[in-house]
Amino acid sequence: ELAQAGFTGVWLPPAYKGIDGDRDVGYGVYDLYDLGEFEQKGSVRTKYGTRQQYLRAIAALRAAGLQIYADTVLNHRIGGDAAETARAVPFLQDDRVHPRGESREVEVYTRFTFPGRKGQYSPFEWRWQHFDAVDYDVKTRESGMVYLFDGKQFDDHVSLERGNFAYLMGCDLDFQNEEVRAELLRWGKWYLDTTGVDGFRLDAIKHIAAWFFPNWLDEMTEHAGRELFAAFRATVGSAET
């Protein structure tokens, strides 16, 4: 019916496991490799179903002559499996330029081991070194803060709202880290091979260094051996402006 109505493509929501399991709409990303296959975060399925249901939906759309665009959320991770101790400098959420104190020890949920998946599809595990910043310290439980890890910096070439809007939520990926970039390339190629989607809707691009996605998309296009569609979301300013 969609094709008959003149639609040529469908944008599907984030298909991977979020922190709230089958209640998560997909933007609270926990495990990009779990498309509704593993018992993690209280459920096997995602909000949208199981891996097999997702793949069957893609096949049905393709059979109807429609292209499929996958919502792609690479900016952050949420719902770490264990806490780690690190040192970080505190900033206010609304001011990413002026520190609110000296470097301090923080306890943060930045260790992602994905025990339900047990290394299937990727053995990569996330540690605090793979992130720039977080917004919650178990020790202080303060709200309204951002903690920038020692030796890190907020990404450049991002929105200048709040002085620097690289940090959005959760555990903010460090796109300067070679291991992080390599893992995101590995995931993207796996996702293309697994789903055969025709392109991506890229989330939160104003929070990610502007140089990252052109390089990532070039790699995805080369791997797919065909042109891929790409669109993005970026809200600039406010409703008043």
Feature locations, PLM:
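Active-site-proximal helices and loops of the catalytic beta/alpha 8
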Residues: F7, P14, G21-G36, A57-L66, ...
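Active-site-proximal loop/turn and secondary-structure-junction residues that shape catalytic pockets
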Residues: Y16, L74-I78, T140, Q153-D155, ...
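Intrinsically disordered, low-complexity N-terminal regulatory regions
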Residues: D20-G21, G151
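The substrate-binding groove and active-site-proximal loops of carbohydrate-active enzymes
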Residues: G28-R51, G79, A166-R181, D198-H207
